[in-house]
């Protein structure tokens, strides 16, 4: 993660996996990621399907599907965030990776897309795929008015007040394969953007949302 928020009551600093070199490296590699590029990445050790349940149990996620795991992890208080694995939301799957490099991919529900947004006042960081275990936004526990509209049909999908999680993000389950017009209002300031939920490389993490 490149974002650092010093001072202020809205940010409580945290360093993932302090004193554990392998876990720190894991957080750096799979944290709030930038857009995927052409550089080849090391091949992870993919957990066999028949062992996925055991792997999830080791991570404290026994019996959970992708949606349940995402909803649980994104809402955790910062001090309860796991330090022995990372969880990255990609357009069609949740990627879980432990400190040894073992990885399991849990498919997202058919036709659904998880979009994480972190509106900010004056501090942010770059992000493309949302990390449920390492990403931090500036505003924690903030009341934000959120509107999400299907740009293709004009249908209003979300129009309500929401509280940012302890990680500073708002989580939205929206339809896959559409374009969204998004608006966030906080203390008289507004941030707007357009996002796509189509394709295999679309962003699941929105952090360029300055409130003005």
Placement of each model-derived feature along the sequence:
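A short, solvent-exposed beta-strand micro-motif common in secreted/extracellular proteins
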Residues: 178-187
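Mid-length scaffold segments of soluble, non-membrane domains
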Residues: 107-157
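Bacterial N-terminal signal peptides that target proteins for export
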Residues: 3-20
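Bacterial signal peptide processing site
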Residues: 33-36
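Extracellular beta-sheet/turn segments enriched in Thr/Pro/Gly and aliphatic residues
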Residues: 104-108, 113-120, 198-212
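Short, acidic Ser/Thr/Gly-rich low-complexity loop/linker segments typical of extracellular
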Residues: 153-167
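Glycine-centered loop-to-beta-strand initiation motif
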Residues: 163-172, 182
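C-terminal motif of bacterial Sec signal peptides marking the signal peptidase cleavage site
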Residues: 27-31
């Amino acid at each position: 993660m490149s974002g650092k928020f010093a001072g202020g009551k809205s940010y409580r600093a945290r360093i993932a996996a302090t004193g554990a070199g392998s876990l720190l490296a894991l957080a750096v590699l799979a944290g709030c990621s930038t857009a995927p590029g052409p550089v080849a990445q090391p091949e992870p050790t993919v957990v066999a399907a028949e062992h996925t349940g055991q792997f999830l149990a080791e991570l404290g996620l026994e019996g959970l599907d992708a949606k349940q795991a995402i909803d649980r992890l994104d809402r955790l208080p910062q001090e309860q965030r796991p330090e022995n694995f990372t969880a990255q939301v990609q357009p069609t799957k949740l990627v879980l990776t432990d400190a040894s490099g073992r990885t399991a991919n849990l498919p997202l529900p058919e036709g659904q897309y998880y979009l994480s947004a972190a509106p900010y006042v004056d501090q942010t960081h770059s992000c493309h795929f949302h990390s449920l275990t390492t990403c931090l936004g500036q505003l924690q526990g903030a009341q934000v008015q959120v509107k999400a509209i299907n740009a293709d049909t004009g249908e209003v999908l979300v129009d309500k007040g929401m509280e940012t999680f302890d990680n500073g993000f708002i989580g939205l389950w929206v339809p896959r394969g559409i374009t969204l017009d998004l608006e966030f209002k906080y203390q008289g300031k507004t941030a707007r953007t357009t996002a796509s939920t189509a394709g295999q490389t679309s962003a699941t993490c929105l952090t360029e949302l300055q409130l003005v």
